[in-house]
């Protein structure tokens, strides 16, 4: 028998965290940051206190109180560590989990509202995702500020500063960053991808852990997991079909039909329908823009055509504004700028990505 616990992403945009359990084993379907909840307490230059580790996110309700799965080095040292979980054990969402029973995180894509809090999970818990998503996650971390919330692919393990329990980051000369295990579906990593994975532009050295390759599916304890590419604004997005305990779970992550890979989303839908003919199916579906729309969505091709019509006649500076990490939209404007003889100016982190 399978058990599903929705820990985030319900009644909100993003923050997806789903716990799937069966036969003493567990998987997470995404482990993201809730932008709305985080935005109630923090902003760009006001973030959780690094010396307090996971205490601030737990206390603010940004992390579910799941004892046993978070990084030990982000839990206060000394006496504070002994009493950390006492305050949460009476909360309704509290669970105690054995990290060794967690076979991994199935991460649908690299947007932080689906992947961001992988950073605080125990570093022995592997991430299963597509090769492209893994590389994008690393590129995002390479070009982001250095703090524990950004440490999805590799992490600097903290240590207690003193008996107060406060944490500190060891100097780069004393401790390399530790890489989390990643298992990728789909394409076999090229040597360029492997080389990129094993390096970091930071001054702190990296203790690399090679990418593992799963092909099209993986057996994780009692679960059979299959990964399907889907259309989304960031490369590498995928949906998952998980079978076990006489049940199938289709998890869409974020998906759409109106981009350049809409046919991939259609293929995932057909695979889920086929699974539903064999087994009872639970569908966990993205619903941010669900609803009746007689006009249908505007396709990315239509966006490109309308933008080009404007850009051809515009004089002076043209400013294009769209969401961060929307690489498809970025490449559209790069192509259009070249087409009309304009120069595209972007941030260094976008160029790195």
Place the predicted regions along the sequence by residue:
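Metallo-beta-lactamase
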Residues: 102-113
